[in-house]
């Protein structure tokens, strides 16, 4: 394995992808370009569903366990604070600047290069590479759809910026839309029933309640009121007040359990947008985790959401870059981080026994 050549290929591919806008649900052009490189330049037999791409390594055997390599092709929209063109890949010293360079382009190109190295080897497991769309919006046409067309997966390695440290647990997400009901009236008279005051009582509970079961890796469930809206004009007592709750769950609770606790304690009407995005965890004793530890990696719990939330099998999140750079102006990745990722991914996977 020539790490220098693979790193250069990865950098070239990353620069190509940075210059193609690929916000969530608008990844077609980037997927077209990536598929062309994978098929024509790398000789990878590439399948496609929508804007999702995947490859299955030679020698697939249903009797073997299957490991999935995953990264996402979509990006968030650039903020107004960029001082550079977010869609122009700029190399300055060791840094590559551009939208999606850190999240999630570096993981994507590193995993593609490692898959190239491993696809023809006789591995004791099946290897699949999947590049998913719509990760940033947890869309139904990304990983959720991919999992309906891929073979059965036993474990996944999800490439996200973690400094190449293994995240073995990840917080889930549930968003609740809450409506407090009152009765309209004239603000000058002692009439009506102010929905804002009912909402404030419930928001006070949201602010002060602590879920009793905490996680050693992920800490407590985090519940935050983030949006509030009520009223139409200053002299009318509002009959409704809507507010939104953002809940980041740990693995001690299902989203359904948290929803029931909230409903039991709020007087307002509560609706969950979805229960899909669950907290995830892989056992510390899993061979993938143990191999990472043997390579000097330190397991941790991640507060940020990824496509792991849609995976109903064990998964570990590990990739080049730093999560703090994601979704920020002048996002960047270091070329040395990509080189390190290619080497570590290869060492992690080449002699792995599941």
Please describe what each predicted stretch is.
Residues 34, 108-118, 146, 199-202, ...:
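Buried hydrophobic packing segments
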């Amino acid at each position: 394995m020539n790490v220098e050549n693979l790193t250069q290929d990865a950098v070239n591919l990353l620069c190509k992808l940075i210059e193609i806008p690929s916000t969530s649900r608008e990844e077609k052009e980037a997927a077209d370009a990536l598929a062309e490189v994978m098929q024509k330049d790398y000789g990878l037999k590439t399948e496609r569903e929508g804007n999702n791409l995947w490859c299955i390594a030679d020698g697939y055997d249903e009797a073997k366990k299957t490991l999935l390599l995953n990264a996402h092709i979509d990006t968030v929209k650039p903020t107004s604070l960029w001082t550079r063109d977010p869609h122009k890949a700029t190399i300055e010293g060791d840094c590559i600047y551009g939208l999606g360079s850190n999240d999630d382009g570096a993981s994507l190109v590193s995993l593609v290069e490692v898959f190239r190295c491993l696809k023809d080897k006789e591995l004791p497991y099946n290897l699949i590479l999947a590049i998913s769309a719509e990760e940033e919006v947890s869309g139904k046409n990304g990983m959720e759809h991919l999992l309906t067309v891929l073979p059965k997966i036993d474990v996944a390695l999800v490439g996200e910026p973690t400094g190449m440290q293994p995240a073995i647990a990840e917080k889930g997400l549930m968003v609740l839309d809450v409506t407090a009901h009152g009765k309209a009236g004239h603000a000058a008279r002692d009439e009506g029933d102010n929905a804002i005051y009912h909402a404030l009582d419930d928001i006070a509970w949201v602010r002060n309640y602590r879920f009793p079961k905490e996680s050693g890796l992920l800490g407590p469930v985090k519940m935050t009121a983030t949006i509030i809206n009520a009223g139409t004009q200053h002299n009318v007592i509002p009959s409704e007040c809507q507010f939104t709750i953002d809940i980041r769950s740990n693995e001690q609770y299902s989203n359904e359990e948290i929803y029931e606790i909230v409903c039991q304690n709020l007087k307002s009407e509560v609706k969950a947008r979805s229960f899909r995005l669950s907290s995830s965890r892989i056992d510390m004793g899993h061979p993938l985790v143990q191999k990472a530890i043997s390579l000097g990696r330190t397991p941790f719990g991640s507060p940020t959401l990824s496509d792991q939330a849609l995976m109903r099998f064990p998964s570990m999140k590990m990739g080049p870059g730093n999560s703090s750079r994601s979704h920020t102006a002048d996002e960047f990745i270091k070329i040395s981080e990509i080189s390190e990722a290619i080497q570590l991914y290869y060492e992690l996977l080449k002699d792995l026994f599941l």
